[in-house]
Regions:
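Aromatic- and Gly/Pro-rich donor/ligand-binding loops
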Residues: 1-137, 141, 145
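A short beta-strand/loop micro-motif in the catalytic core of glycosyltransferases
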Residues: 150-151
């Protein structure tokens, strides 16, 4: 079983970094079993996150970036893919996705919904961990995704 942290992103946000790092320590698993999406590996290495999390940087292949631009222009959203699709692709049913990060639900409908949808489609367990949100920012889409989380 592996644990995926798709919304940590990088240590530039110290709250997200602290939640990801402390969660990894609490899981008490080899770092190879804890995979974190990262946009700034040097910063996370400097902060020591690489000691307890396997950091993975994901970039969309050129062909997918072209398809994404065309799909936006032609309004064909079903063809669009994100870094989250590629990051979560290796997930197996026995794996767990942990959405870490303080204020990630305080902004419009975002990647938390997308990552939860991807993991749920794969039959994986999902955990919402260390998150705040304001009632004024609660949308129907967020309510739906909150109900999908297993924990």
């Amino acid at each position: 079983m592996k644990f995926y942290f798709p919304v940590h992103l990088d240590g530039g946000n110290r709250g997200c970094e602290a939640i990801a790092k402390s969660t990894a320590i609490l899981l008490n698993q080899p770092k190879e079993n804890i995979i974190g999406l990262c946009t700034d590996i040097p910063t996370d290495n400097k902060l020591g996150l690489n000691q307890c999390v396997t950091l993975r940087h994901v970039e969309l292949p050129l062909y997918q970036r072209v398809i994404n631009r065309l799909s936006r222009y032609l309004h064909l959203d079903s063809l669009r893919r994100s870094i989250y699709d590629y990051f979560l692709k290796p997930m197996k049913k026995e794996d767990i996705m942990i959405s870490t990060g303080g204020d990630m639900m305080c902004y419009g409908n975002n990647f938390v919904i997308e990552t939860n949808d991807i993991a749920t489609r794969k039959g994986c367990k999902t955990v919402l961990w260390g998150c705040s949100m304001a009632a004024s920012n609660l949308t129907p889409e967020k309510e739906k995704t909150l109900r999908k989380f297993d924990i």
